[in-house]
Amino acid sequence: MLRVVVLGAGAGGGVPQWNCGCEGCRTARAIGDELLRTQASVAFSGDGEHWFLINASPDLRQQLNATPQLHPKPGALRHTPVAGVILTNGEVDAVAGLLSMREGSPFTVYAHEKVLAILSANSIFNVLNEKNVRRQPIAISEPFEPRLVDGARSGIEVLPFAVPGKSAWYLEGKAHPGGETGDGDTLGLKITDKTTGKCFYFIAACAEVTDALKAEIDGAALVFFDGTVWQDDEMIKAGLGHKTGKSMGHVAMSGEDGAIARLADLDIDRKLFLHINNSNPALLPASPERKAAEQAGWQIPADGTEIVL
């Protein structure tokens, strides 16, 4: 049985963002829990006892405390159910939370060599003592089984695959520690319970829905997909920025080439948008954009949403 918990469904900055007065952030401050979103991450487990995180958001401490499944076991002075963290990119909102896991509990960080090179180039991550926190390279199209802290098998297979994307924004115009060529900056993941065969996909950053990507996820029981923006130029139109979604590595939800249209013909049991920006009107429960997304079979999840496969 595969259990999945949405730790955070928001994009960088979350909802409300600390310095933002857009409609989404104003509404979130006014109505509270229904709209609040921390930054994107999910946790999964094959046995309900040992858990793995996909990405470590800057909100990780808050997310762990808000998720009973991830609390230390009763009676233990030092303990965590978290056995590992799998990184799908090197963006701040995917790696900064690692710094909140510096208190000495052992776990493994799984990431592509390009992302591990970013961590190695930033000495602040040395606070994660290598005696306790192992860094394990993963490769595109090479499945692996993340291990429990004692080295035991988890019973879960993880398949990393390349998706259209870009390197972290803070590396734009700078030398990439992991090299300028080759894939690896942006990964999707297929997570499979080796006992039941049930699986889900995690694709929180994707610049384009390609035919190869469609073929990969067709027939899935569950897909978490990039829901950063509703339309490509929404941040520009709202006066919130000067970049399009695609230039930031994110396909829009709407439009002819958007995720809703491009994935409409696939056989997917459950589709959830993740990494939703505060500018995205689909966050607002009464908006026409939310209605359109839900009528197309998509869910806008709240933090704490749990799914069992």
UniProtKB/Swiss-Prot annotation:
Gene3D superfamilies: Ribonuclease Z/Hydroxyacylglutathione hydrolase-like (3.60.15.10). SUPFAM superfamilies: Metallo-hydrolase/oxidoreductase. Pathway: Cofactor biosynthesis; pyrroloquinoline quinone biosynthesis. Signal peptide: none annotated. Keywords: PQQ biosynthesis, Transport. Belongs to the PqqB family. This is Coenzyme PQQ synthesis protein B.
